[in-house]
Regions:
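Soluble, non-transmembrane alpha-helical interaction regions
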Residues: 1-86
Length: 86
């Protein structure tokens, strides 16, 4: 009986592609840059949040932060996939 991993491997067309050290480093750099952008967005939002009193504005700021983080993460995923496809 085959494991789920073996079945998935067969369906995907073979062995998983091993990444070269250069590609691994590119991906690591992309991840570091994305984490830095997320950290900067959080810090900026925290500073703005400290001066806000209107609950609606606070909700908008939090929603904007969530959207910005999602955009950064989606962009990271696309860039990582492009590196893997090279």
């Amino acid at each position: 009986m085959k494991s789920a991993w073996e079945l998935a491997l067969e369906r995907s067309g073979g062995a998983l592609q091993e990444l070269s050290p250069e590609k691994k480093e590119k991906i690591a750099e992309l991840e570091r840059a994305a984490q830095a952008k997320i950290a900067a967005a959080k810090i900026t939002a925290e500073h703005k949040l400290a001066t806000m009193t209107d609950p609606d504005e606070i909700d908008q700021l939090k929603e904007g932060l969530v959207n910005e983080i999602r955009f950064i993460e989606e962009s990271l995923a696309r860039k990582k996939e492009a590196v893997r496809a090279e």
